[in-house]
């Protein structure tokens, strides 16, 4: 049986168990409530589409692109007339249009996200002022989950449906246009920043041009001045509509124009204002000249420097992360690799920690790779060493005086391709050097390999182990006419020509020639200011008795390259001047540095509601804030709002809130909900007896139910969860959240699973085609297998024990998991779910990692419409979801069906998932042509995409599922820190002190700038906001949680308990002392110091009386 067949067979087995349990009638539904879907068409029908639409989608997919299918389906649904009512009746048209736009949007978003359900509130046929009919699409906040492109296409779909139904254009009034202008400005000032901030004129142009009304529900309690407009139902902000206009139509204008032309939809020509080049090259040049004296705009990641999250490197700063192209087995899909030694030395970077970066893209997650270059550090004793070993990094990190170079950042070609960002010049590295040798005329003629194994399976590890000394490196360079080996190439561009000339004169004053270096003690150089030049060049050396000692090879190289003075030409870069005098070609070792700062910490933690309940059973305020059902039961009878269910037995007809009638045992029907008195003590006692559990001290419930029908969970489930120390989420499932990281290959040893177990799961051979016979072989992971964190494995083990308890004690069936340790869970099925989606993805546990993350195939993450730039997703045991998930428990508010497994994708089709995964590199080495293209400058990745092997080139073939190779090996996917320093430090003072201490070590960071950044973008705005919030706050009851804008005259809550402030004085003061301390210790901008003083005055005025205190005459003597 093939892999997908195995998954499907196991899924059917679990469904059979769940179906048998549900048939007992103890749950509201008699069948599992998560339908299966094998492909996009079935997911769409399962989520939103009318019955039978899956078949039609599959027919159209044979000859159309996905976008064309979406629009064709929309047209067919919009023009049908078999809805209740008369043909051409507006209600029928609205119903058709509503179904059409939701189904088409579901197709465009892979049938995964909740936007088709929640992002579009409704559609409506409305009146223009001239009496014609127009079409309005009401967007809600969750449209954000679809992304800008899908939101834009939803508007275009609305226009297509409008035309299909023969409706006129939307004709906005001047007041309606100005309402949008005001809302955009209010949204940014009062709510949050938009990804694209349109100007007022751009908003006016868009609203006049869009042929449908883009409107929506109120999303924020912020009132507008343009009030009481006849066609706008709310006087508050319509966030969904603004997102659709600004981040959709305007920001994605190029895509709309493209699709409008392809589908021959007229009326969108006005968008060329946004897509046309704004000026000619001459005008751009003039603009550049006129703005030469203007300050440069800050890099995006530097705009918000957060306390405790250090800046690792300023934009393009020398000594930052060196750009190196390639992919290791745990990088790609927005995650990028650095050396684990770098992670250990800086301590703020652990596996899965987010970084906000300068390029490419906005952010990433860091993962380890030990076949790239580690950091170069200066120790307190003056030694300069390159650290390429984790244990060495741990042993010396307290002795580090300066981090001269942070090491490589391994960036996949696909990361540039994703945004079609022009390629930056690559680092000069071993894998490039080897290909230059291979391409040389000398090699082609003589086949002299110099001991290098040139074949298509050549691995970087072999190159790194090559024993090449300096003389041999120069010999190879001269014979092959290729640049000098990277090992003997220094960071010449990081120093000036004057400094190199100074160093040249100094060295040749001590040593006559490079050959003399190999004589006794000639590599001992007296220490003076030239040491700093050698440090910045990145040359390792030791200090002993006031002498600098470097290796003979490095000194020979330095003197051979700097054999005469460099040209003083000011227009010439240092590396160009070096090449003019060097006997061999010298490449720039680090032509591109990447800046970045620490972002969100890595995470692996069980999903808990606040406070965390064991059962979705309401107990009101009868147990106070602890919400313990056992405590509430001591009250005897309590009054709560519950579902009203009527017994279906005609001889009984008793009303209750249970699925089974408590009197006759027949099924009940849900009718409504109402407040009622229940004997909780008896219910709880019966529940304990039903599951044969001795009385527990604590079983936590909820204050009230937020679902529409108010149907509670059976108390028995809560008791069994409490018994196994697990907690439910709002839909009845138990979840564990982890940071997403990609993985294309694993080693049985590193995931803690014996190879025999791996064989049982259908794995047969390693990446070299050899049979699996030990725990150390590298194996390509199957696309729906995942490696969860050890803490996730331990929590799921508890969940499995709960499920077995549930099957035995509640459903009176055989246990299923019988797991004694987490390894017993290997091979079992899970459902993965992203928070903004409504479709789970079937997965299988294949192992465990010590890191705080969930490793999975890039396809698995993309199937959830996620990448790996710090996204966090949930994992749940599939049988738990099938037994306990209930749509009835979902919140009735907008967005309630988001983050719920309304459908389960059981098979991942690479062609149907998010296309970001199509950019994943599959190359054993980066082609030489790509390296050369990076040197040209400004080359777009799309122009050279045919030179690379990636997923996109494999789609539709069997190779899309396997053979996704990597260029850079790593010995372990969990090398380096597992928890970043930010999470281990308890106080903000400790975090900031550590942040600034690291800034003092980093050559690529300005310490004063970091201090000012933390104050300006974090502490000062936070204090100002807290002062404002303190003065506007409500008071809160300590028992029932009721809130009051003003303290009642009685001074207490209506329930008789005390009232307290909801915002404490401490929250206002928390950053004041540390801000003052930083302003005194560092020479920061006087303006920032004044801001601190003004805030301090305001705080003192808030908490202390401004009345002058009477003084005695003694005070004046």
Swiss-Prot record:
Q: Which GO terms describe its biological process?
A: DNA catabolic process; DNA-templated DNA replication
Location of the region described as Disordered in the Swiss-Prot/TrEMBL record: 279-299
Q: Provide the E.C. number(s) assigned to this enzyme.
A: 2.7.7.7, 3.1.11.1
Q: Which UniProt keywords apply?
A: DNA replication, DNA-binding, DNA-directed DNA polymerase, Exonuclease, Hydrolase, Multifunctional enzyme, Nuclease, Nucleotidyltransferase, Transferase
Tell me where on the tree of life, at the top rank, the source sits.
Answer: Archaea
The protein's matches in Pfam families, at most eight in alphabetical order, are given as: PolC_DP2_cat (PF24846), PolC_DP2_central (PF24844), PolC_DP2_N (PF03833)
**Catalyzed reaction equations:** DNA(n) + a 2'-deoxyribonucleoside 5'-triphosphate = DNA(n+1) + diphosphate; Exonucleolytic cleavage in the 3'- to 5'-direction to yield nucleoside 5'-phosphates
Gene Ontology MF annotations: DNA binding; DNA-directed DNA polymerase activity; single-stranded DNA 3'-5' DNA exonuclease activity
* Keyword NADP applies: no
User: Bias category Basic and acidic residues: which stretches?
Assistant: 279-294
Report the protein's function: Possesses two activities: a DNA synthesis (polymerase) and an exonucleolytic activity that degrades single-stranded DNA in the 3'- to 5'-direction. Has a template-primer preference which is characteristic of a replicative DNA polymerase.
Subunit-structure text: Heterodimer of a large subunit and a small subunit.
Family membership, please give it.
Answer: Belongs to the archaeal DNA polymerase II family.
Q: What is this protein called?
A: DNA polymerase II large subunit
Where does this protein come from, organism-wise?
Methanosphaera stadtmanae (strain ATCC 43021 / DSM 3091 / JCM 11832 / MCB-3)
């Amino acid at each position: 049986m093939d892999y997908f067949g195995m998954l499907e067979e196991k899924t059917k087995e679990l469904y059979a168990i769940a179906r048998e349990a549900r048939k007992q009638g103890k749950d509201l539904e008699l069948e599992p409530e998560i339908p299966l879907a094998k492909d996009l068409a079935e997911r769409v029908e399962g989520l939103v589409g009318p019955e039978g639409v899956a078949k039609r989608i599959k027919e159209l997919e044979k000859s159309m692109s996905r976008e064309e299918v979406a629009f064709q389906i929309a047209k067919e649904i919009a023009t049908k007339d078999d809805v209740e009512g008369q043909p051409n009746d507006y209600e029928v048209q609205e119903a058709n249009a509503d179904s059409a736009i939701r189904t088409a949007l579901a197709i465009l978003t892979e049938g995964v996200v909740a936007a088709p359900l929640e992002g579009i509130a409704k559609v409506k046929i409305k009146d223009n002022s001239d009496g014609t009919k127009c079409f309005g699409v009401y967007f809600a906040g969750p449209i954000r989950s679809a992304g800008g492109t899908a939101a834009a296409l939803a508007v275009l779909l609305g226009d297509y449906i409008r035309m299909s139904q023969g409706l006129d254009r939307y004709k906005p009034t001047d007041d309606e246009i100005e309402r949008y202008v005001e809302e955009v400005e209010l949204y940014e000032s009062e709510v949050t920043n938009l990804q694209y901030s349109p100007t007022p004129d751009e908003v006016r142009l868009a609203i006049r041009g869009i042929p449908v009304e883009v409107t929506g529900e109120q999303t924020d309690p912020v009132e507008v001045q343009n009030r009481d407009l006849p066609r706008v139902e709310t006087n508050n902000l319509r966030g969904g509509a603004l997102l659709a206009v600004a981040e959709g139509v305007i920001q994605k204008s190029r895509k709309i124009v493209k699709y409008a032309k392809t589908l021959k939809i007229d009326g969108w020509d006005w968008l060329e204002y946004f897509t046309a080049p704004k000026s000619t090259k001459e005008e751009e040049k003039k603009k550049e000249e006129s703005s030469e004296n203007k300050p440069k705009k800050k890099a995006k990641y530097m705009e918000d420097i957060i306390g405790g999250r250090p800046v690792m490197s300023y934009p393009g700063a020398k000594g930052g992360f060196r750009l190196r192209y390639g992919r290791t087995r745990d990088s790609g899909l927005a995650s990028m690799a650095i050396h684990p030694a770098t992670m250990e030395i800086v301590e703020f970077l652990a596996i899965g920690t987010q970084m906000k970066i300068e390029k490419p893209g906005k952010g990433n997650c860091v993962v380890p790779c030990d076949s790239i270059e580690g950091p170069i550090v200066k120790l307190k004793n003056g030694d300069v060493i390159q650290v390429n070993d984790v244990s060495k990094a741990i042993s010396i990190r307290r002795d580090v005086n300066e981090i001269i170079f942070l090491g490589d950042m391994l960036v996949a070609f696909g990361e540039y391709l994703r945004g079609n960002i022009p390629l930056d010049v690559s680092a000069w590295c071993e894998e490039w050097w080897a290909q230059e040798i291979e391409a040389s005329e000398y090699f082609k003629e003589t086949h002299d390999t110099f001991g290098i194994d040139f074949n298509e399976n050549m691995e970087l590890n072999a190159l790194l182990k090559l024993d090449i000394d300096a003389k041999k490196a120069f010999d190879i360079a001269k014979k092959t006419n290729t640049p000098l080996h990277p090992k003997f190439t220094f960071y010449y561009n990081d120093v000036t020509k004057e400094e190199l000339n100074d160093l040249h004169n100094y060295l040749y004053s001590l040593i006559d020639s490079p050959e003399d270096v190999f004589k006794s003690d000639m590599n001992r150089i007296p220490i003076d200011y030239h040491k700093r030049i050698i440090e910045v060049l990145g040359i390792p050396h030791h200090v002993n008795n006031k002498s600098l000692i470097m290796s003979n090879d490095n000194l020979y190289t330095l003197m051979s390259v700097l054999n005469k003075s460099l040209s003083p030409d000011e227009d010439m870069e240092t590396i160009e001047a070096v090449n003019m005098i060097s006997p061999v070609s010298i490449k720039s070792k680090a032509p591109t540095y990447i800046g970045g700062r620490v972002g969100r910490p890595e995470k692996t933690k069980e999903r808990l509601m606040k406070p965390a309940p064991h059962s979705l059973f309401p107990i009101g305020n009868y147990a106070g804030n602890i919400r313990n059902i056992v405590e509430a039961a001591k009250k005897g009878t309590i009054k709560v709002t519950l579902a009203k269910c009527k017994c279906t037995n005609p001889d009984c007809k008793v009303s209750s809130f249970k699925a089974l009638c408590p009197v006759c045992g027949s099924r009940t029907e849900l009718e409504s909900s109402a407040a009622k008195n229940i004997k909780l003590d008896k219910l709880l006692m019966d529940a304990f007896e039903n599951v044969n559990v001795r009385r527990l001290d604590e079983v936590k419930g909820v204050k009230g139910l937020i679902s529409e029908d108010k149907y509670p969970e059976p108390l028995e489930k809560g008791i069994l969860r409490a018994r196994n120390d697990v907690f439910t989420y709002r839909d009845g499932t138990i979840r564990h959240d982890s940071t997403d990281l990609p993985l294309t290959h694993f080693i049985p040893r590193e995931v803690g699973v014996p190879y025999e177990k791996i064989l049982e799961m259908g794995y047969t051979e390693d990446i070299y085609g050899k049979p699996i016979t030990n725990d150390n072989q590298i194996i390509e992971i199957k696309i729906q297998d995942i490696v969860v964190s050890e803490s996730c494995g331990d929590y799921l083990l508890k969940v499995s024990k709960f499920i077995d308890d549930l099957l035995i004690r509640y459903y009176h069936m055989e246990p299923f998991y019988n797991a004694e340790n987490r390894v017993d869970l290997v091979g079992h099925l899970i459902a993965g779910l992203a928070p903004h989606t409504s479709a789970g993805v079937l997965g299988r546990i294949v192992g465990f990692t010590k890191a705080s993350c969930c490793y999975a195939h890039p396809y698995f993450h993309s199937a959830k419409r996620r990448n790996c730039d710090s996204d966090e997703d949930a994992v749940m045991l599939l049988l738990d979801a099938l037994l306990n998930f209930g749509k009835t428990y979902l919140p009735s508010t907008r967005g309630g069906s988001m983050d719920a497994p309304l459908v389960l994708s059981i098979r991942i089709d690479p062609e149907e998932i998010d296309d970001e995964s199509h950019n994943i590199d599959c190359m054993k080495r980066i082609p030489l042509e790509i390296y050369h293209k990076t040197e040209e400058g400004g080359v777009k990745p799309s122009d050279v995409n045919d030179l690379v092997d990636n997923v996109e080139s494999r789609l539709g073939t069997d190779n899309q599922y396997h053979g996704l190779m990597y260029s850079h090996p790593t010995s372990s996917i969990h090398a380096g820190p597992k928890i970043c320093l930010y999470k281990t430090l308890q106080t903000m003072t400790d975090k900031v002190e550590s942040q600034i201490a690291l800034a003092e070590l980093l050559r690529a960071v300005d310490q004063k700038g970091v201090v000012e950044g933390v104050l300006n973008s974090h502490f000062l705005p936070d204090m100002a906001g807290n002062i404002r919030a303190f003065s506007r706050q409500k008071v809160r009851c300590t028992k029932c949680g009721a809130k009051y804008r003003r303290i009642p005259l009685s001074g207490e809550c209506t329930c008789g308990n005390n009232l307290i402030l909801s915002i404490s004085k401490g929250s206002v003061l928390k950053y004041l002392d540390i801000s003052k301390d930083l302003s005194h210790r560092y020479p920061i901008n006087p303006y920032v110091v004044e801001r601190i003083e003004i805030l301090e005055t305001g705080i003192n005025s808030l908490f202390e009386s401004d009345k002058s205190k009477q003084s005695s005459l003694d005070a004046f003597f």
